[in-house]
């Protein structure tokens, strides 16, 4: 997950910046309106820099006793940023800037600044503060409540988060003429609608369940050796760091830590990624690091000359997830990359002769399909079912068709329908398992499967000009990263998602690439 603090109001604020404006000093200012807005953007970006690092600290290293004071501090900061974001003079600056002569890059920067400003100005300051407080409280308590399967305790805090999120969704819907859920989607996937997602996901539901069953049956006759023993966290971290080096992560501008829920946070110049270790196996944490490194490389590769402005940020969360899933699924699970993982793992665990670390065995471990409860541990094939379930619930929750108290039962029903599993009485492995909803990140989940689809499409396009398998076998992935940099990373948010994908691949999102990728990997 890319940790865009789902206090989206804060994230949204992230993009524009402040200028203490006094009418009496107008004549002393020589900058045109566009440059004022850019300066404004960079100043608020600095505040959000601090907010992002503090958010990482809260998730990774803050002692439990610091939660209440931290919540107050974060709420104060979010209110401050929101106030800067909604200063009255910004409307005049936008009006003036639109009449100025701007180049294509400047026009895109202005467009994105205005879009983010419009999203921020619809929310009253009191709501922003209330959401920050409720989200911090709910998220912190969730960390222990999930462990204890304490739905009753979680529900008391979550009720307020949902109420405030529904209020936000309604305000945004009235301002934009969208449905409440579409208005929330716009925060993560600009231009994407529920209608589009319903169409894409409905198609997936026609072929995914049967494909899952066919692959599980096919793999039932295949033998593999599951990791058994003790894999020290220190050794797992050292292994992860070596893999990050292979993926050319810039350690001068980032680091790896631990947290309850893996994420990528920080800022492009200081990217913080986390994972979690289970000393009885190493498979999940290792590929989790590969996933978060994909997020991090995207952040580190964003256009530096646009830093501090919306145009210099990631295009959408779907594109962000496409990069993490490109690393994890397209590259990370390829036979050539698995060969590197097998060698490195055998070295770090001093078990080069252990059959667990044979290339073919590691390959089977990373392409094993099974129906499971946990999204973050799900395999590539069953993962979309987890996403579709969440999409359908949060869509109906934000549109007021269901109540938050309905969620556990609905979750159980959908898990049984899509994966044949029941979560009745097991909410810690059901509706309480994700961090997203604890602070109101409704609308984020579709980004994961959209990202998987974009990633498959990017790989298909890349292979037309790049010897991908050869680069991975050689252990020099530079040609792969050069393609991503040229076609995705360096373009930030200069183009719409549709246009970005079309420029890179020759067409807009085409889910057939994802379907073909899955069939090729798991049936051929």
Could you describe each region identified by the protein language model?
Residues 3-4:
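Polybasic, lysine-rich low-complexity intrinsically disordered segments
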Residues 18-30:
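Short, Lys/Arg-enriched N-terminal segments with co-localized hydrophobic residues
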Residues 30-190, 519-523:
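A well-structured
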Residues 33, 52-55, 65, 69, ...:
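C-terminal, non-catalytic "cap/extension" segments appended to globular domains
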Residues 131-282:
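Contiguous, non-catalytic segments that form substrate-binding/exosite surfaces or channel walls
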Residues 284-300, 321-325:
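Active-site recognition of the HExxH zinc-binding catalytic motif
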Residues 313-353:
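Post-HExxH zinc-binding segment in Zn-dependent metallohydrolases
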